[in-house]
C-alpha cells in the first residue's frame, strides 16, 4: 500500500501522518527531507538560478520516487508527504510503482478550512501576515487528483475529516500532462 498525503505548506500533512496510528508500521518519506539533501549534495548557495533550483527539485523527486519503488518491491507499506500539485508530477511516481507492483495507491489531498489554515500558518510563522494568503493561492493551483491517473482511491482531508471522492479527469488533460513531462526530459 502506498499513501500519498499531498497539499500546500501548512495544510497539516505532517500533523496528519504523525497523529495517525495506521502509519506506525509504514515507511515514511517526506519530500522536504529529500529537497534538503539534494540542495546539500548540489552544494547550492542561498542564491541559485531557476535552472539550478529546478535541477535540485527534479533530483529530489527522482530520489523519492526511487525510494518509494524500492520500499514497494520490498513489500513495505509507504506513506509519502509531498506537494504534488500537478498531475505531471504525480504520473511518474504512479507509473514507477505500477511497473513493479499492483499495490493500491491512495492519495489524500489536504484541504483545511480557512480557520484551520490560519491556525496552522500562525504556528509556522506568527510574524508573516502574508503566509495565509500565499498558501490560499497555492491551494488554488492544485490539480485535483483523480482515479484516471492510476489511484485506487482518492480522498480530501478537511480539518481531520477524511472524505472519499471520485472524479474523472478529461483524457485530454491527462495527455497534456504526459506531453509536458516528455518535453521536460
What does each of the following model-derived ranges do?
Residues 50-58, 83, 128, 132:
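Flexible, glycine- and charge-enriched loops at secondary-structure boundaries
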Residues 25-30, 106-109, 154-156:
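Conserved beta-strand scaffold positions in the cores of enzyme catalytic domains, especially
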Residues 44-48, 98, 123-127:
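Short, hinge-like loop/turn segments at secondary-structure boundaries
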Residues 100-106, 148-153:
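Short glycine-/polar-rich loops that comprise or flank the Walker A/P-loop
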Residues 2-6, 11-15, 19, 23, ...:
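Conserved GTP-binding G-domain of TRAFAC-class P-loop NTPases and closely related GTPase folds
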Residues 14-76:
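Conserved substrate/cofactor phosphate-moiety recognition/catalytic segment
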Residues 1-3, 75-76:
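Pre-Walker A (Motif I) flank of P-loop NTPase domains
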Residues 55-104:
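Glycine-rich phosphate-binding loop used to anchor ATP phosphates in small-molecule kinases
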Amino acid at each position: 500500500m502506498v499513501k500519498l498525503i499531498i497539499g500546500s505548506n501548512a495544510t497539516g500533512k505532517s500533523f496528519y501522518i504523525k497523529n495517525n496510528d495506521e502509519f506506525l508500521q509504514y515507511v515514511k518519506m517526506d519530500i522536504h527531507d529529500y529537497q534538503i539533501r539534494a540542495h546539500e549534495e548540489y552544494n547550492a548557495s542561498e542564491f541559485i538560478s531557476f535552472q539550478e533550483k529546478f535541477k535540485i527539485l527534479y533530483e529530489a523527486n527522482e530520489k523519492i520516487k526511487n525510494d518509494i519503488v524500492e520500499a514497494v518491491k520490498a513489500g513495505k507499506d509507504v506513506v509519502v508527504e509531498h506537494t504534488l500539485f500537478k498531475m505531471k508530477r504525480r504520473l511518474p511516481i504512479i507509473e514507477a510503482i505500477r511497473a513493479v507492483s499492483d499495490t493500491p495507491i491512495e492519495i489524500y489531498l489536504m484541504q483545511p478550512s480557512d480557520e484551520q489554515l490560519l491556525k496552522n500558518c500562525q504556528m509556522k510563522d506568527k510574524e508573516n501576515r502574508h503566509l495565509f494568503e500565499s498558501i490560499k493561492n497555492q491551494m488554488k493551483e492544485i490539480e485535483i487528483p483523480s482515479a484516471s491517473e492510476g489511484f485506487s482511491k482518492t480522498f480530501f482531508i478537511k480539518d481531520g475529516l477524511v472524505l472519499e471522492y471520485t472524479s474523472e479527469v478529461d483524457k485530454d488533460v491527462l495527455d497534456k500532462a504526459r506531453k509536458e513531462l516528455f518535453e521536460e526530459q
